[in-house]
Amino acid sequence: MLTKRIIACLDVKDGRVVKGMQFKNHEDMGDVIELAKFYSQNGIDELVFYDITASAKNERINRAWVSKVAQNISIPFCVAGGIKSEDDAKELLANGADKISINSPALNDPDLISRLAKSFGVQCVVVGIDTFKDENNELLVYKYTGDENKSHHSGKKTLEWVKQVCELGAGEIVLNMMNQDGMRKGYDLDQLTKVRQICPVPLVASGGAGAKEHFLDAFKLGVDGALAASVFHKKLIDIKELKLFLKDQGIQIRI
């Protein structure tokens, strides 16, 4: 059995880490380098950095902070936001990122997934999916969620898009469940179950973690990683305590 991963998510805006609720009303959480160092030293298995404005504003990720993060931490990290080409990905990987993640650019150009997988290997290519459950319990994929004024339904349904990106060469999927984001009431287990059944690649749950038990629930469903932000940024959950709790519950985790 593969070791499960605890992942901290850092939404980056103008070199600062921010956190919103349901992808809105972001508040400042601190300096990106200092937070990255804190997590690297305190037991997080992996970091994901989302430049939340890059795709929406059609900008490139600032390479300076990516390089600085790589110099200051000793754990794997993934970078996302505005990656629209092989050259964009190559530059970020050259600056020290272990993986790159694409979201809205993949919706605009699905073949980008295949090109990146071919150029850099599937292990480097993560697809982020921002999924929203509407009033009819329909699971819909949203795009440009980094800007609440531009965020809208992409026209795709979540389960169909999951199947498509896996076929195109995604090495991992991060499922960002928008309804739960920042609410700290637990991951959407029903949605995770549906996605796990059709997703043959590593799956990371994102959106809703508020207690140690929420991570346990997700891992019991078979996800490979559980991602959280506000509970870690605000130190509401101690990472080492979380890992010991999970180990005691029979989850294979790196202590």
Curated annotation (Swiss-Prot):
Enzyme's top EC category: lyase
Cellular localization per UniProt: Cytoplasm
Catalysed transformations (reactions): 5-[(5-phospho-1-deoxy-D-ribulos-1-ylimino)methylamino]-1-(5-phospho-beta-D-ribosyl)imidazole-4-carboxamide + L-glutamine = D-erythro-1-(imidazol-4-yl)glycerol 3-phosphate + 5-amino-1-(5-phospho-beta-D-ribosyl)imidazole-4-carboxamide + L-glutamate + H(+)
Pfam families to which the protein is assigned, alphabetical: His_biosynth
Residue positions of the active site: D11, D130
Predominant location category: cytoplasm
Involved pathway(s): Amino-acid biosynthesis; L-histidine biosynthesis; L-histidine from 5-phospho-alpha-D-ribose 1-diphosphate: step 5/9
CC per GO annotation: cytoplasm
Enzyme Commission code(s) on record: 4.3.2.10
Entry keyword set: Amino-acid biosynthesis, Cytoplasm, Histidine biosynthesis, Lyase
GO MF annotation list: imidazoleglycerol-phosphate synthase activity; lyase activity
Taxonomic superkingdom: Bacteria
Quaternary state and interactors: Heterodimer of HisH and HisF.
Family the entry assigns: Belongs to the HisA/HisF family.
Name of the protein: Imidazole glycerol phosphate synthase subunit HisF
Name of the gene encoding the protein in the UniProt record: hisF
